[in-house]
Amino acid sequence: MLEVNILDKKWYSIVEDPKGFTLNIINASLKELKIDQYKPNISIALADDNLLHQLNLRFRQMNKPTNVLSFPCEQLSSECDLGDIAISIDTVRKESDEYHIPIPAHVAHMLVHGLLHLLGYDHQKKGEEVVMKNLEGKILASLGYNMCAI
């Protein structure tokens, strides 16, 4: 089951139906990854800088907001609790302006990025980063988006 919690009304200024948009991106990504049959449980918080700052400080000891955080729970299996994703509308909006990326495309990128972290992908090392970025690009292309420059 996919759960989407809209914690900031600013999300409605991005897309008319933030929950539907989020569900479509995650479901299409799971299908593109050929793992939709597992029907994983994922909770997604569409939040703001305040919450992402708190979470980033608590779990990563970084005293600043960030665009997306992922909290893996279980490894992929049938109906597993895959984990949680939180995205800040404020940081995503700033990055979209800075890099001239349409906001919905950047939100899609952050959702895919967060999902890949739940699945165990990382970008701490160069080789891992290349694998993750290539997979992000493939998924985003399947959704009709160009790979964003972040």
Swiss-Prot record:
GO terms for biological process: rRNA processing. The keyword Ion transport does not apply. Its EC number is 3.1.-.-. The keyword rRNA processing applies. Keywords: Cytoplasm, Endonuclease, Hydrolase, Metal-binding, Nuclease, Ribosome biogenesis, rRNA processing, Zinc. One of its GO terms (cellular component) is cytoplasm. It is found in: Cytoplasm. Its cofactor is Zn(2+). Gene3D superfamilies: Metalloproteases ('zincins'), catalytic domain. One of its GO terms (molecular function) is metalloendopeptidase activity. Binds 1 zinc ion. Zn(2+) binds at residues 113, 117, 123. InterPro entries: MetalPrtase_cat_dom_sf_prd, YbeY, YbeY_CS. Pfam families: YbeY. It comes from the Bacteria. SUPFAM superfamilies: Metalloproteases ('zincins'), catalytic domain (SSF55486). Single strand-specific metallo-endoribonuclease involved in late-stage 70S ribosome quality control and in maturation of the 3' terminus of the 16S rRNA. Belongs to the endoribonuclease YbeY family. This is Endoribonuclease YbeY. It comes from Wolbachia sp. subsp. Brugia malayi (strain TRS).
